Structure formats: C-alpha cells, structure tokens
Design a protein with these regions (language model features):
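Intrinsically disordered, low-complexity regulatory regions
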Residues: 1-113
C-alpha cells in the first residue's frame, strides 16, 4: 500500500503537468524561467505569498469563513510544486533558464556549464 504522503506528491506532480499545459504551452514564447526574473528569489517570493495566503485563509476559517476559490489543500499542493521549481532552478535545469546566469539570474561565468 502506498503511503498517503507519496500519493500527495503524485497528485502534485499531476497538477504540475496539467498547469504546465497552460503556463508553458508550445505556442507561446514564454518559458518557465521567464516567470522568475530574479531567479530563486522570485520563486521564494511566490512561496512566501502562498504561505501568507494559507495563514489568511486559516485565520478566516477560525472565524467561520470558507475560502472562496483556492483551499488550503490547493495551496499546499502549489507549495510542493514551487519547491520543486526552486530545486530545479538551483540545479540549472528549469526550462528556458540561461546557463550564463547564476541562481539569482545575474550574469556570470559559470565553471560548471
């Protein structure tokens, strides 16, 4: 029997695949790395915004409100995926990432190209 946490990771991976069809469709010139102009710092900004949203929703739920659109669970799945983008960026493997730039998207001479 598969561990529930592994099932969540697989669900997040499937969500990432489906969202990629919209965010990175083949007819577009926009590459995944274009969403992160400051490299890992941009990804961390998005992760921080997701965490703040979770706090906001949970605080509202404590007072009886329900989320209008994205649930805490949805945000959790997004966090898993943004964490995977962070690691992929750190490994210089993100689609459209310029290998002549560092993890902060600054120009550099990388020795490990």
């Amino acid at each position: 029997m598969e561990r529930p946490s592994i099932a969540v990771l697989l669900e997040a991976a499937e969500l990432q695949r489906k969202k990629a069809e919209d965010y990175n469709n083949k007819a577009s010139r926009v590459k995944q790395a274009d969403y992160y102009p400051r490299g890992v710092m941009s990804i961390l900004d998005i992760i921080n915004a997701k965490v703040l949203r979770i706090y906001s929703v949970l605080e509202a739920m404590e007072n009886g409100a329900k989320p209008n659109f994205e649930s805490v669970e949805d945000s959790g799945l997004d966090l898993i995926n943004y964490a995977s983008f962070l690691v992929t960026y750190m490994r210089f493997e993100l689609e459209g990432q310029d290998l002549n730039r560092d993890i902060f998207n600054r120009g550099c001479d990388r020795e490990d190209k």
